[in-house]
UniProtKB/Swiss-Prot annotation:
SUPFAM superfamilies in UniProt: ACT-like
Name of the protein in its database record: Cytosolic arginine sensor for mTORC1 subunit 2
Function: Functions as a negative regulator of the TORC1 signaling pathway.
Organism whose genome encodes this protein: Xenopus laevis (African clawed frog)
UniProt keywords, alphabetically: Cytoplasm
Record bears the keyword Cytoplasm: yes
GO terms under cellular component: cytosol
Gene: castor2
Family the entry assigns: Belongs to the GATS family.
Keyword Zinc belongs to the record: no
BP terms from Gene Ontology: cellular response to L-arginine; negative regulation of TORC1 signaling
Amino acid sequence: MELHILEHRLKVASIAKENIQLFTYGLIKLAFLSSKTRCKFFSLTETPEDYTIIVDEEGFLELPSSEHLSVADATWLALNVVSGGGSSSSSQPIGVTKIAKSVIAPLADQNISVFMLSTYQTDFILVRERDLPFVMHTLAAEFTILQVVNGETVAADNLGVTNGFVKPKLVQRPVIHPLSSPSNMFCVTSLDPYTLPTVTTLLMDVMFYSNGVKDSVVGSEEPDHIRFFSFSLIEGYISLVMDVQTQQRFPSNLLFTSASGELWKMVRIGGQPLGFDECGIVAQISEPLAAADIPAYYISTFKFDHALVPEENINGVINALQVSQAEKH
């Protein structure tokens, strides 16, 4: 298996809901007029708390400097696992539960914090740039590590870090944060970039302007219903995560879905904002899912984490994670 270190240098930022109008010009340019920018990696996720942005340094320049933009203090690098040769876009993606044992757990064992972004196409593991030597040392035995340089995939330089490593003890990793499962059903989908202009107005409404009456009506009918929408445009590929009510607003022939039309339920992780320094949160969730062979998407945001699991597995997932929670007591 190959681990690709992509060349994007990323910023992770948060915008409060009430301040989004200060940033819509730049965000619309990044999402819908990307040919007018040098940005190659852009993701915007709306949660009930805020908007989380993951964007490369070129794209970050499109956003105004503002006290209303909270930026995590590190530069992040995106890694992804590819089974076999070829570019990351053409090879088979591997679900987050499939990389739980080989990537997520070993990094947690070495106290390396990760930030996850699953998309329709693949799973990106974000690590702080300063942690890269430790990441490579930790994963070198398991993977062929390749680096993308000027668009070419080449063997990664061995950064030769050996100090400070101890063979980790195999520890139990109980789930330590509160879990909740909203009532929404979600789909993970994509669309052809050439069709983006036909739904730009709709997407702009969904992303920035639909916080009005419709949502409050839905909310009153289903108290556990939450606002969650994720749009990613990464290296020319679009990924969308939305609930079924939002999906129904789109022309059905434009969205890609799996042949099974799979629907997903969400597990939200965290009672208080999680921060960026705690290690092992993704591992706490993904390891029990991997043990049960349950596929999952995983989306970290500025304040909370979100796992998406097949609708039919949600009860088993909650039970497995609650068992893990009980083990900490």
